[in-house]
Amino acid sequence: MEHMFPEREIENLFVKWIKKHIRNGNLTLFEEFFKTDPWIVNRCDKNGSSVFMWICIYGRIDFLKFLFEQESYPGEIINPHRRDKDGNSALHYLAEKKNHLILEEVLGYFGKNGTKICLPNFNGMTPVMKAAIRGRTSNVLSLIKFGADPTQKDYHRGFTAWDWAVFTGNMELVKSLNHDYQKPLYMHFPLYKLDVFHRWFKKKPKIIITGCKNNVYEKLPEQNPNFLCVKKLNKYGK
C-alpha cells in the first residue's frame, strides 16, 4: 500500500531540501528550480519560514542578487512581508545579522517600492528593535534611513529601540541615535521597566539608573561586573 503524505508535509520536506542547498551555496541548482517555478521563493516550511527568508538567514548575497535580477520590479515575485509563525519577516532576521551589506542590499532594492520597515512581529518587535537588542548599530541606522520608526514600542514591555539600546548597554548606538536623529529619542527609561524585566526573566538587570526623567546615559567603569554603571547626560548625549 502506498504511503500518502499530506500536501503540507510534502511542501515542508521540499523547503527543507532547498534550504540545505541554500546553506551549502548551491546557486546553480537553485537557478534551475527558479526557472521552472519562480514562486519557489515564497514556499514555506512548517514554521512558516519562506525560501526567501532562509536565503536571508544564511546570508547568501549571491542568491539575493540573482533573485533581484529576475524581477521586473521589486516585489513582482518575492514577498518581503511574508511572516513566520512568530510573526518575523525576512527583515527581522537580517536586522540581527552582523553582515551589514546584506541588509543594505535588501533595503536598497525593496526601498524603491515602499517596503514596510516597521512591520512588527506578534510580540510587537520591529526589525529596528531586533537590531538594537543585538547591538547592530549600522543595521539600526540603515533601517531608520529607510523609514523605520525608532520610537515605536513593543507590545509587552513598552520598550522602544532606544530603550533596548540603553538596557543592553549599547551606548554607541544611544549616542548615534541622539546625535543623528533629533526626534524625541532621549525618552525616559523608568526604573520600573528594570523591575518588570527582572521578575519576568529572573535575571539581574544589566543597568543601574538613578534617575527617571528625560536622560541619556553613558557607560562608566563598572564597579560590579553584573551591572552597567551609568551617569546622566543631556538629551544630545554629551
From Swiss-Prot:
A motif (FLCV motif) lies at residues 227-230. Pfam families: Ank, Ank_2. Keywords: ANK repeat, Early protein, Host cytoplasm, Host nucleus, Host-virus interaction, Inhibition of host NF-kappa-B by virus, Repeat, Ubl conjugation. Its main location: host cell. SUPFAM superfamilies: Ankyrin repeat (SSF48403). One of its GO terms (cellular component) is host cell cytoplasm. The C-terminal region contains the docking motifs PxIxITxC and FLCV, which are required and sufficient for binding to host calcineurin. Interacts with host PPIA. Interacts with host PPP3CA/Calcineurin. Interacts with host RELA/p65; interaction of the 32 kDa form with host RELA results in the formation of a stable complex with NF-kappa-B. Interacts with host PPP3R1. Interacts with host EP300; this interaction inhibits the association of host EP300 with host RELA, JUN and NFATC2. Belongs to the asfivirus A238L family. This is IkB-like protein. It comes from African swine fever virus (strain Badajoz 1971 Vero-adapted). The gene is A238L.
